[in-house]
Amino acid sequence: LDLGFEKFIELLEGAHEIDEHFCDAPLEKNAPVILALLSVWNCTFLGAQSQAILPYDQSLHMLSAYMQQAEMESNGKSVTWHGKEIDYPTVPTIWGEVGINGQHAFYQYLHQSNNVVPADFIGSVESVTPVQGHHETLMANFFAQTQALMQGVDETQVRADLKAKGRTDDYINKVAPHKVHKGNRPTNTLLMKRISPRTIGSLIALYEHKIFVQGIILQICSFDQWGVELGKGLANEIEKELRESSNKLNQDSSTAELINYFRKVKREVA
């Protein structure tokens, strides 16, 4: 909206394009369906406990937070729409960061942790930054990371590389195990022509339809948030007690102690 209402219309038009694709495309070519199937496979069948959203464009720096809210609030359930308790994983923890920031923060974990984290890499062909050569450097890292996560590097290759660099056998024996990357880490690559209101609208709709399909496959209702509602109801009662001075609290012992401590410190600093 800050860019003008016409840009907001473009965002809606981009979303509508994915709406039509979702309705019309056959299942084997339906992008939201394919993404949903991959997510269910990785989480429910292979046991992946989290998924990373990694956009390589600063204008998408809030995308991972939005996807976290959209997917975890929609599908973070443990009961089917028939009221039966679910005995299988439903949704992973969604998290992420702009690509280059993430490379210097948690990519080590993605590459060599014993927890496999599926990741969505999101980039564009055209740059929106007028800095000469910047986008090619950025996208070189983009493609390199997905390649490294897919292929990895085994100990034989590590030893050969170190030997070619003139390292001693003693050094190679010590370092080689630490440089092994097992690879076979699942990633999706979403490559847009250019980051724009239209493509952002399409991207958001793509993920929202994917979340809906996941809910259908998992047999859960994606459109309620009773877990959130429980906390809101409790907060209303606790807020009254925080504002009162009565020592009698209608709370469990743990919460009562925390409330009493809060009120005590508040009186001291008043």
Model-inferred region functions:
Residues 1-132, 140, 152, 181-183, ...:
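Active-site phosphate/pyrophosphate-binding segments
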Residues 130-170, 176:
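Acidic, Ser/Thr-rich peripheral helices and adjacent loops at domain boundaries
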Residues 27, 36-37, 172-175, 199:
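Short secondary-structure boundary micro-motifs
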Residues 42-43, 171, 202-203:
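Short, flexible segments with low predicted structural confidence
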Residues 158, 166, 173, 184, ...:
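Short, intrinsically disordered low-complexity segments
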Residues 1-13, 182-226:
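Short alpha-helices
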Residues 29, 176-177, 212-213:
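Intrinsically disordered, low-complexity segments enriched in polar/charged residues with Gly/Pro
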